[in-house]
Amino acid sequence: MDARATIPEHIARTVILPQGYADDEVIYPAFKWLRDEQPLAMAHIEGYDPMWIATKHADVMQIGKQPGLFSNAEGSEILYDQNNEAFMRSISGGCPHVIDSLTSMDPPTHTAYRGLTLNWFQPASIRKLEENIRRIAQASVQRLLDFDGECDFMTDCALYYPLHVVMTALGVPEDDEPLMLKLTQDFFGVHEPDEQAVAAPRQSADEAARRFHETIATFYDYFNGFTVDRRSCPKDDVMSLLANSKLDGNYIDDKYINAYYVAIATAGHDTTSSSSGGAIIGLSRNPEQLALAKSDPALIPRLVDEAVRWTAPVKSFMRTALADTEVRGQNIKRGDRIMLSYPSANRDEEVFSNPDEFDITRFPNRHLGFGWGAHMCLGQHLAKLEMKIFFEELLPKLKSVELSGPPRLVATNFVGGPKNVPIRFTKA
């Protein structure tokens, strides 16, 4: 065993295995212990390759802003166990990536492909969507209010609003949104028994990997026809932009276009719904914060940022060292794998006072919920806008909100958040 592997096994298992993320009272104390005792250290647990775990805000930023040294392309950017990793490579010709998305690229390739939609996702561009987003938000708020005082915020509201927004932006017909919801949940839910299409107590790693591959294939089959359609009949949507984009004078290969579609459809939906659910949990547990937001709508953008920080819907991304280097006094060797922990970075006491508290007055809020560096979330401005509009529409119509039962969290070390948020509310 590598002498640098110093993290106690029970701590390492908590922060590496998906199950640890299903309980905030387990995962956050483990991260605090690491920040205090071993902020950057290597871990070995059965079934996973050795990895460094970066838990400090400064280290996650330092690694994230150096794509030339810490690569997304060299190894999988998703934390897989060894069985999943082997299966993914077996179906992709030895490549560590199942889809050729932005998150699996390094500059200059990443720069070129990200540049195709960069302007579309800038604040000035997405303002044209505001009227339509507000209409969708108003319908979603009314849907919630129609439950007449009690509902599950996630399954009755939060899953559908961001899905409708991002599918509208992408250009997916509204009738196909249920399919997109299922595929998105399958994409992020391979570790979650409740999200499995196969009615089995628990999938083996190989079964989970096969289902993931099947989900990708279904996504690609669905999107293939749209590329042809948008080239002959372009519309004002992201699919039309990508279908008609060229690099070096040629249309983009279908595998890259489809991967782009999948990335927008999945990341643009699940992260926003998770953060919205986190916001409702925070407001329910802290009624004084709800009163503040209702009395001063100017605080709603801060509410949005605090929800992203506090919920941290992206749990981890992986990097691979391209050369020997040093971070926080630790010798990182070429080929070493590093897990970047965004939930831990977002609760770093050196950056955030009272980091475990949900505080919508927190400013500045230097959270890393949207990542950092070249791979910082492309759709962050759209996500912030849709959450801002949603709470602008919802809060004036609420007198109070409280949890009517314990929230349940998704068990995932990749992307996820609240799975169920049962609430009781009174209308204003």
UniProtKB/Swiss-Prot annotation:
GO cellular component, one term: cytoplasm
Chain segments annotated as transmembrane: none
Cofactor: heme
Pfam families to which the protein is assigned, alphabetical: p450
Role played: Catalyzes the hydroxylation of alpha-terpineol.
Similarity field: Belongs to the cytochrome P450 family.
Protein name according to UniProt: Cytochrome P450-terp
Organism: Pseudomonas sp
